[in-house]
Design a protein with these regions (language model features):
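Active-site adenylate/phosphate-handling loop in enzymes that bind or generate adenylated species
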Residues: 22, 45-122
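Long, low-complexity, charged/polar intrinsically disordered regions in eukaryotic proteins
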Residues: 114, 122-134
Length: 139
């Protein structure tokens, strides 16, 4: 997990619960220093400009760079989380959300992702409901 200043504690708790429910080992890696380095490096180019989505997208890109470095070092394959609906409308951060070797949900619509998530939870609550509900806020 790579929380940042704006990551709610409850989001970290839910992600940890999901990893535990799936039997996935996880750790927490700070992206704060990397993010600050990017901002410092870009400060002259951004001078006089308002803070906007650019800085928010840098967080995602820091996560993507970190995941790709771990992938290269450890021989893992990074899976992206984008789905068919997001790809169709361009709702993603290039080199952030899209950083990875395979998109498991590439042919699955966002509506079906929610249906599959809820279906998976019928037998046992593997995916914390707050994760599903919070994703609905960004549609």
């Amino acid at each position: 997990m790579m929380p940042f200043d704006f990551t709610a504690d409850i989001s970290v708790e839910d992600a940890s619960a999901l990893a535990k429910n799936l039997g996935i080992n996880h750790s927490e890696i700070s992206i704060k220093e990397m993010f600050e380095s990017f901002n410092k490096g870009l400060s002259k180019s951004f001078e006089g400009l308002e803070t906007d989505k650019t800085e928010e997208n840098l967080q995602s890109r820091c996560r993507g760079v970190t995941l790709m470095a771990l992938s290269n070092k450890l021989g893992y394959l990074v899976l992206t989380t984008g789905n068919k609906s997001e790809a169709a409308v361009g709702y993603s951060t290039l080199y952030g959300d899209t950083a990875g070797g395979f998109s498991v949900l590439k042919d699955v619509s966002k509506t079906l992702v929610y249906e599959l998530s809820n279906y998976r939870n019928i037998i046992s609550n593997v995916i914390p409901q707050r994760i599903i509900e919070s994703c609905l806020l960004y549609t």
